[in-house]
Structures are given as C-alpha cells and as structure tokens.
C-alpha cells in the first residue's frame, strides 16, 4: 500500500515542513502495520467460524511445492517489463529477491498555511488503511497547531468508488491530495509495481519491513515520483492467502482442478 501525497503540494512546503510530513507519514504507516498485524489472527478465526472453513497455517503446508510451481516467475516478470521498455526491471526485482506511532514534535512555528487535505483509500471506514489516514491527520494537526487538517474519504468516495480514478485524482492533486492504495491498482499505470506481489520474496513481516524501508522501498518511491507523487511510506494488507470451498490445501497438488479468482494482474494470473 503506497501512502502518497501529491508532489506539487509536497514541494510547496518548506524543507522543514516536508520533514514533518514525512515523519507523520512514516508513523502513520507504522501504525497501520501494527494494527493490521495485531488483529490478523482474530480476524482469520472469526472469518473461518462464520464461513465454516478450516485454516491451514503455513507451518503445516508443503511450501516448497508452491515455490517449485512458480519457479522462474521472477525471470518471466523481468522479461515482461523489459518487453515494455522498462530497462530497470532486473535491478528492481533484485532488490526484492535478495536476502535481506503516537508522538510528534510541535512544529507550529514553521508558518504552516491553513489548509485541508483529502485522504482517500479504497477500503471501508473501519479498515486499517483508513485508520492509518486518521493517524496521519491526527499527527499533522498536532504538529501544525491545527493549521493542517485531513479529511478521510474511505471507499474512494471522491471518485465514485473507482480506485484507478482515485489514484489519477491524487496525481492531479484534486480532489485527492493524499491516498493509500494497493500496488495492484498502481500496476495499471506502471507494471513495475507488480514487483511487490512476486511470490515468496518475503520470509516474514520483519523481512517485508526491511525491504520496504530499505533499498527496495526507495526504488519504488523513485518510480512513484515519476508520476508526480511523493511516497511517505509503504503500508500493508498482510500476506496473500489461498481460500477455496472444496478442501484443505497443503501442497500445490491440492490446487488441481480448482478455479482460482485473482486480482486483475498479469503477474498473479501467471502464478
């Protein structure tokens, strides 16, 4: 989830004000990650109980069989990007595949303009994405002495629920100034953003954090800047899971004859 602000708006701030925005943005991302992970097990158990399904944990699965099934997908993805003219494809993939909340100072003396920014996300008001936006607004209002306020618009209300138009509105700077949207939606604008969804590139939450907060995340921020966006941090929606109504899945053999619905991504469909 890329937590971005329109670059023109960001560049209109002084360097010190930009530091405050970045600090608040990173704290909001850390907060979203924390609450996302804190409720993960509880949400899964409640969902399983309501739907009468069995949850198979990673430790009980033959993960190697899945890794073998998608062996070579990294090279496929690189070639796909190169065929579309993205010469940095290999470097981008290498960054992902190699080994690898509440306090803010008072900066109200920095002559902040009185303004209101609209935050958009595609999920509901009660989602961790919206909570992350609220945390950012809370931190910014405190840091600026109430001069900068943030309105929260969940479910992409400002663009009639259209996620792609939500990102386009962010690029335009109107009516959206800040947003948290999935890399899959961004991949409609630039397929390089699919690199985040390569299978088995994260061994753990700590590994994911290290990549998103390190060189890999810095590269993604560079690409976002090409679209007039300043990325304050990279949040998350948890690890992808396979669900079905037929039987328990422990190895790739259990996937035979199952029809699997995935998001509109060439990479996910290839997997």
Question: Where are the model-predicted features located?
Answer:
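N-terminal secretory/targeting leader peptides
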Residues: 1-207, 225-271
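A gly/proline- and charged-residue-enriched helix-loop-helix capping module
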Residues: 203-223
């Amino acid at each position: 989830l890329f937590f971005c602000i329109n670059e023109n708006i960001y560049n209109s701030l002084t360097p010190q004000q930009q530091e405050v925005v970045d600090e608040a943005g990173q704290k909001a991302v850390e907060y979203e990650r924390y609450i996302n992970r804190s409720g993960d097990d509880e949400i899964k158990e409640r969902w399983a109980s309501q739907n009468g399904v069995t949850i198979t944990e990673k430790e009980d699965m033959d993960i190697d069989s899945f890794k073998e099934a998608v062996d070579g997908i990294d090279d496929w993805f690189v070639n796909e990007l190169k065929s579309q003219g993205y010469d940095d494809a290999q470097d981008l993939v290498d960054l992902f595949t190699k080994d690898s909340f509440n306090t803010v100072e008072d900066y109200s003396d920095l002559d902040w303009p009185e303004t209101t920014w609209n935050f958009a996300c595609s999920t509901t008001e009660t989602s961790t994405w919206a909570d992350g936006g609220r945390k950012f607004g809370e931190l910014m209002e405190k840091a600026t002495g109430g001069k900068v306020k943030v309105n929260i618009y969940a479910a992409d209300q400002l663009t009639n629920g259209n996620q792609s138009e939500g990102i386009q509105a962010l690029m335009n700077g109107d009516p959206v100034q800040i947003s948290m949207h999935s890399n899959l939606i961004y991949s409609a604008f630039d397929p390089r953003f699919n690199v985040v969804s390569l299978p088995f590139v994260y061994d753990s939450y700590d590994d994911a954090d290290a990549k998103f907060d390190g060189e890999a995340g810095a590269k993604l921020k560079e690409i976002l800047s090409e679209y007039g966006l300043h990325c304050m941090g990279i949040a998350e929606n948890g690890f992808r899971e396979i669900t079905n109504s037929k039987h328990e899945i422990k190895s790739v053999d259990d996937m035979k004859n199952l029809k699997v619905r995935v998001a509109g991504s060439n990479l996910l469909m290839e997997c």
